[in-house]
Amino acid sequence: MILHIAITTLLASMSACSYEMDPVLTQRDWDGTATYFQSADEHGFSMYYKPQVGFVGDPMPFYDPVAKDFKVMYLQDYRPNPEATYHPIFGVATKDGATYESLGELIPCGGRDEQDAAIGTGGTIYNPVDKLYYTFYTGNKFKPSSDQNAQVVMVATSPDFKTWTKNRTFYLKGDTYGYDKNDFRDPFLFQTEDGVYHMLIATRKNGKGHIAEFTSTDLKEWASAGTFMTMMWDRFYECPDVFKMGDWWYLVYSEQASFMRKVQYFKGRTLEELKATTANDAGIWPDNREGMLDSRAFYAGKTASDGTNRYIWGWCPTRAGNDNGNVGDVEPEWAGNLVAQRLIQHEDGTLTLGVPDAIDRKYTSAQEVKVMAKDGNVTESGKTYTLAEGASVIFNRLKVHNKISFTVKASSNADRFGISFVRGTDSKSWYSIHVNADEGKANFEKDGDNAKYLFDNKFNIPSDNEYRVTIYSDQSVCVTYINDQLSFTNRIYQMQKNPWSLCCYKGEITVSDVQVSTY
């Protein structure tokens, strides 16, 4: 009886306080506030992949004709890395660039005194004759002596893409062919219609950047074919990737120079026309933005095609101290999250990047969009907002994974607007993507106190001043797309679980069809 009374009393007590602990009420209160919240990335990224431990560096995508999926090898970056033996090759498998299966470590680093103590990026190809996968990669020597090669191209093979065997008799050295022995790396493989295999290697010759070419009929014996392409001026093209898409040949590469640090491309209707784009520093650019495909927050991009779509995988860097503004002449931290995008080929052969369909399809849960605060002259009509110069609208908190879409109609091609994140009603500073039509680019900037420009990406401004904007985020990684003309990858810490806003910096804009969804 005493026990029964005690239990009854306890249940009554719990019932009395259940209102205060009600998770629905807590959620309601949370949604009803718009002040800044110090959020943090969760342990796992589900779409812009990151391993449970460490980070993704220099992806090496390959379409597997046997398994009928994409295999994306990458350099595993531990923090901290061992002094001498670092960046083993790990891998993931994906059908669509939206979900990944970890393959774990595939090719380990060599020993401290071996040529591949540290591993650099490379490329994979399948040989249907011997039914082996071949991965050619860069072997980085630890503290090479003056008579040793700092970088050598090496190879490992596998019958099943699981168990790999290094060929300890294959060492392709640059100085054997008149190239630099310390810059001889990033091998890339492709096969032409005549059945010949081509290997391209980023290197230098007499101090100038070159892409060396080697050819083979069996992937075992290789012959030098001289220089495939020279590099413009004093620039150096990392992670070269050559492919044919429709009627055009392309070279996609990552510009190493600190002032650039972007993925770019050249094009030609034939391989010879492609090679001529940089010959004698010709600078025959493919478009009006020197072939820039994304911002400096998308690097080491390489492509693979399943015969229908061609995707590009690069990494979005982390930033020291989780500081969105910690961007110097070069990204302060190497490696980050794996980001997949889709190549869009336009009628004139130019390329831009778009979202893979499978990523777009992930966001199936529509969210209510609520105005939490307004500043300046804002006219609201249903879900359409007209913002005069200096006006802004703050919307309710985002989730962890977000798809944001809306259409902006500007009054002229001189108008300037932006999308801001980590912007609470009490925030002193926040981070924004500024769309500057008069300059033909989008900027990533810190707004509010201690405002500053961080970096930008150019794109073709619409002649009708209408911008169809879609933003995809997975925790702190987000990619903004505008009109199939702009791809703008960014790392924005704390954007999840915080309010966001639309702003008009110059002129007048009308924003319609604002939608947010999650998964």
PLM regions: where:
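Short, aromatic/His-centered strand-loop micro-motif at the edge of beta-sheets
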Residues: 447-468
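Surface beta-strand/loop "capping" patches
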Residues: 350, 354-410
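Beta-rich carbohydrate-recognition and catalytic domains
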Residues: 18-186, 190-234, 244-294, 316-376, ...
